[in-house]
Every structure is written in C-alpha cells, then in structure tokens.
Amino acid sequence: MQTYLVGGAVRDRLLGLPQGDRDHLVVGATVEQMLALGFTQVGRDFPVFLHPKTQQEYALARTERKQGRGYTGFVCHASPEVTLEQDLLRRDLTVNAIAEDEAGQLHDPYGGIEDLKQRLLRHVSPAFAEDPLRILRVARFAARFHAQGFVVAPETLALMREMTEAGELAHLTPERVWKELEKVLLGPTPQVFFEVLRECGALAALFPELDALFGVPAPAKWHPEIDTGIHTMMVLAQACRLSPELAVRFAALCHDFGKGLTPPEFWPSHHGHGQKGLPLIRDFCERFRAPNECRDLALLVSDLHTHIHIAFELKPATLLKVFDKADAWRRPERFAQLLDACRADFHGRTGFEERVYAEPDYVARALAAAQAVPVKEIVAAGFKGEAIREQLAKRRLDAISRVRDEWTFLED
C-alpha cells in the first residue's frame, strides 16, 4: 500500500503558488483496508475516503472506461492491482498528472514537469476526448494560470475543436456549465476562458449570444477597439479590477448582448441595444439556471447603462425614474453594483482605461440626497395616502435638482 499526493497540490507547489486542497491517491489497498485504518468512505461512484485526523481526501487508484456519451458515462474500476501510471493516465492534463510519494519523490510518467516549465496545458492521452467537460476545464485553467504565462497546447486545442464539432458539448448539463462559468468569473482573468472557447468553436456552441458579438462594429469615436466582442472582454477585465462580486462580472459579460441583434445595414450604430438584449439575457439565465441576483443585475445593467453614461444630460425627473425603475430605494447595494458595471463598461475601451468618468459619482450623490428625504416629516405635515407618495417624489426631485446645481457649480 503506497500513498501519493496528486493533482493541483503538486502542480501549485512546483509553480510556487499557494496550495489548495490536498488530494491523495492510494495504490495497492482495498476498501476494507482503508476502513480498518479508520478512514471514512464518502465516494458514491468510486472509493474516496476521509482521513480520520486531517479529513483530507484519499482515493483508491482506479481506471475509467467510457460507456455512453457526455461527461457522466464512465465506468470506474478500483482495485489493488491498478498502478500509479494507470491512474494518472485517466487525468485531463499532464500538469495535473504528477504524483509525489511520502518520501517527497516526484513521479511524472507523462511529462507534466516539462510542460510546467514550458507553460503548456496539454492533454495526457486521447481519452481526453471522452469527457466534454474537459473543454471547459482547460479553458478555465488557461484563465486561471494566464498570469503565469500558460497557454493551451496546439494539439490539445485541436482535439477540443474536434470534440466541439462532434457535438459533445450538447451532453453537458446546464448546472455543470454554470458551475464552470461561475468558477471562471470569480477568477482573475475570465476573458481568457472565453477567448479559448472561441478558438475551439465552443463559444458559439455554448454561448451563442456572446459569440455573436465578435465582428460586430461599434462607432470608432466611442469604441476605438471597434469590435463589440473585444469590447465585452475588455469590460469583463475591468469588472474584475473593480469588483470581486459574481453578479457584477456576469452583468459586465451580458451588458451588450443586444448589439448582436443589430442588422448589419445599421452598423456601427446600435440604438436601443440595451432593451433589445433583455430577452437574450433572460433566455441565457434560464438556460443555465443562473442565480436570480445575477439575472436581475444583468437585466438592470443592460437596460440602464446608457442612462448612467449620459447622467449629466438627464433631467432630474428622468434620473428619479431611473432610481424608481432600479428599485434603488429598497436595493441600494444592487444599485451600487449597477454603477460598478457601468464603470467597467466605460473603462473597457481602448484608450479609456484611465479616463475620468464622473457620472456614477454624480448619480450616487443624487441618490444619497434623495434617500435622505425624511418620510416622517411628510406624514407630520399632514399628508395622507397617495399624497404622501406624491410629496415624497416631489421632495426627492428637489433634492436631486440641488445636487445637479451644486455639481455643475463644482465642475465649473
């Protein structure tokens, strides 16, 4: 019976990165032996155990045989006869197929250490093609390790393209796709994930609303990068710089879906694109069962981001309608997220990364002034019923107007 540290912990240590979960592989043991040593079995589909003291995971060495389509159609075989090399062969990437024994000796039968040095994400064997989820995992790894200079090996990218063309991605469940999407959006450079998917054709297969944006031009005056798909990736990168929140980053991803619907004869203008994108966002969120908070913020950003961009041109009454529509009175935190997404949209353009964008600050100040209007004073003044609501709106409008006047004075 031999125990090895495997997977991400070994990879990250060799890269000099913080180690996450420590997964162990046990070769030459039976279920009965593990239980006798005090381990607790937790694996349903294959033998995985928790260490009695550390609670770290220990899995028996196993092989996998494809039976059926998709990423769930596998039959696992675990026995004391399965070797270390056989177990590592079933793994996705060579950099994840390195093992370290209890003496600290590395075992690298498939060249993972060299690929770490070359910064390559390369599949271990042709069996990679049996699991379509690996397309998303490789794209996510490319995003996760982008800062370290990793790229997908050409032969792996070619295999991912073959899998996509064979329709394998159709076998992924919506929940599993969203889980991968959520992981990558919470990472540092999610735009790389979508770029890799586009290279292998998977973006069109999984996220056609996003793929449709590439090649769609926008006015060069406001979008020197021209391409709406490129702009969306730049906005996503800015959103990651501005906010750690999943909903903000997701909203940044979806904010220009409507531009993909503009007929070419109207390019590069996209009048009303925010509203045109709303059905696409709803369908996207329903398809992948996205959390309500992600859906709701994405809809708000698509609908209102152009209003925020021209906030200085809006009448106070129009700005009050924006606050009402966004339910900013009851959901001020979500409105702050909307402003962050708008900041990402503004700065996500070539040459605009460091430009001053004061509109969200003005809008936030106007909202704060309107929120400060005391309802108790209105009631104390004798207003009743519908008159309370009307008087509250009037006083909020006056508060916004004062902010507008003061802001104009400060700017001058």
UniProtKB/Swiss-Prot annotation:
Residues that coordinate or bind Mg(2+): D21, D23
Cofactor(s), by name: Mg(2+); Ni(2+)
A Gene Ontology biological process term: tRNA 3'-terminal CCA addition
UniProt-listed Pfam families: HD, PolyA_pol, PolyA_pol_RNAbd
Cofactor note: Magnesium is required for nucleotidyltransferase activity.
Location of the HD domain: 228-329
Keywords of this entry: ATP-binding, Hydrolase, Magnesium, Metal-binding, Multifunctional enzyme, Nickel, Nucleotide-binding, Nucleotidyltransferase, RNA repair, RNA-binding, Transferase, tRNA processing
Further details from the record: A single active site specifically recognizes both ATP and CTP and is responsible for their addition.
Protein name: Multifunctional CCA protein
Gene: cca
